[in-house]
């Protein structure tokens, strides 16, 4: 596999999470006790006008579609409706093919406590029997690094967007989760859930449709990876929370804006593992978001993985998008040996096993924790070194 080296300069991941409102498009979230969400959505549109694009029943209850302003105002006062939000754009949190040293240093780093790197990656578990859902641009399932373990599941992108990864980001992320060469968990089953188009952009309504599909159809034990996001969005956060409540562990990118991750979604979801990015010298990456909504860090700069241009393609990318699948892979390793573990228990194991206080440039209020998979098969006997009360596994803090 020949990694590409034809790209922008170092630490130049894709755009920040600033979102744009989609004119006339809205997300309507029902109250938890609402019955028959698809039927209710159709009824409300018949009464008030508009069009239903997606009906949500599993991660949350509600629908997304085009609505006239009068309908929006009426729905805000409907007793079945919790809230209405404008649909907005979202995007991936990594990109740009980049030159880098010829080694998958991210894998090398997460199996040892300290530098220097050992030029090897040692693993015990492989994630066999665990399903990882890549909620992204899709996956090039035929890539040799997946060894037939990648399948296509769902496409939420509206229009004529094909059931393929026409961007490359999702294939790269999947490779870091579970590629034979580039992956943390080399035996997982990889599932493509497409919510971003060929440009790497999408809408919250598409993301929620993907989350809703995973919640309804996941083969457990299951992990979901979301190397994407946008400005704070309550419906997006609620969808992730509902999916986690169903038993699926979520690994989510903190974002690439060098600011507080709590202002982004779904990074600000308390129920998920939110991941910041580091460099090869154990520094917080200059682009990485930070703050109390970040749970831990993982390698994210100059990460080599599979790409979509051929079945043997590989490139280097940077971003919190690249850090996040390291954690998703670690979750899969844990679930192989603890298949009945809840997302809270998976989070506690990863959080507690992380290497403490080796990172530089981590702002106050952010956890100085680096992913470590050497203890991935063992529930940590000690409580986490950093306790964040908003996180569900904070009960492990003493």
Residue positions per predicted region:
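Ser/Thr-rich, Pro/Gly/Ala-heavy low-complexity intrinsically disordered linkers and tails
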Residues: 2-8
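N-terminal domain-start motif of subtilase-like serine proteases
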Residues: 8-20, 66-73, 96-134, 154-166, ...
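C-terminal subdomain of the subtilisin-like protease fold in secreted/lumenal serine endopeptidases
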Residues: 12-17, 53-54, 188-192, 206, ...
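Autoinhibitory propeptides
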Residues: 12-16, 42-106
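Structural recognition of the beta-strand scaffold that forms the well-ordered cores
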Residues: 26-29, 64, 83-85, 131-135, ...
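Short, surface-exposed ligand-recognition loops at beta-strand->loop->(often short) alpha-helix junctions
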Residues: 29-37
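Subtilisin-like serine protease catalytic core
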Residues: 102-103, 120-152, 160-206, 218-223, ...
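The feature captures the short pre-catalytic strand/loop hairpin that immediately precedes
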Residues: 279, 300-326, 357
């Amino acid at each position: 596999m020949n990694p590409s080296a034809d790209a922008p300069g170092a630490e130049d991941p894709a755009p920040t999470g600033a979102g744009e409102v989609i004119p006339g498009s809205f997300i309507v979230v029902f109250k938890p006790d609402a019955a028959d969400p698809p039927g209710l959505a159709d009824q409300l549109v018949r009464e008030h006008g508009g069009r239903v694009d997606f009906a949500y029943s599993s991660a949350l209850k509600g629908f997304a579609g085009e609505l006239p302003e009068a309908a929006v105002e009426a729905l805000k006062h409907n007793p079945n409706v919790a809230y209405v939000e404008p649909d907005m754009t979202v995007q991936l949190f990594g990109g740009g093919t980049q030159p880098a040293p010829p080694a998958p240093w991210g894998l090398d780093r997460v199996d040892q406590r300290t530098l220097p790197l050992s030029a090897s990656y040692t693993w015990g578990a492989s994630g066999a029997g665990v399903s990882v859902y890549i909620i992204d641009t899709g996956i090039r399932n035929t890539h040799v690094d997946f060894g037939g373990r990648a399948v296509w599941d769902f496409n939420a992108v509206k229009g004529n967007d094909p059931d393929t990864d026409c961007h490359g980001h999702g294939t790269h992320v999947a490779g870091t989760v579970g590629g034979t060469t580039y992956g943390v968990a080399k035996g997982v089953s990889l599932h493509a859930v497409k919510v971003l188009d060929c440009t790497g952009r999408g809408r919250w309504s598409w993301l929620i449709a993907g989350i809703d599909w995973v919640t309804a159809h996941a083969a457990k034990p299951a992990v979901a990876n979301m190397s994407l996001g946008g400005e704070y969005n309550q419906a997006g956060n609620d969808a992730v929370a509902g999916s986690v409540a169903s038993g699926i562990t979520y690994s989510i990118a903190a974002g690439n804006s060098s600011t507080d991750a709590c202002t982004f979604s779904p990074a600000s979801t308390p129920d998920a593992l939110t991941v910041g990015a580091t460099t090869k010298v154990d520094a917080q990456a200059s682009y990485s978001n930070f703050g109390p909504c970040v749970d831990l860090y993982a390698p994210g700069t100059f990460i080599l993985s599979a790409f979509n241009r051929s079945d043997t393609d590989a490139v280097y990318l940077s971003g919190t998008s690249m850090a996040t699948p390291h954690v998703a892979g670690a979750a899969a390793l844990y679930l192989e040996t603890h298949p009945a573990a809840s997302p809270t228990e998976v989070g506690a194991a990863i959080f507690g096993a992380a290497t403490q206080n080796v990172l530089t440039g981590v702002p106050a209020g952010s956890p100085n924790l680096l992913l470590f998979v050497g203890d991935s098969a063992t529930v940590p006997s000690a409580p986490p070194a950093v306790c964040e009360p908003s996180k569900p596994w904070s009960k492990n803090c003493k």
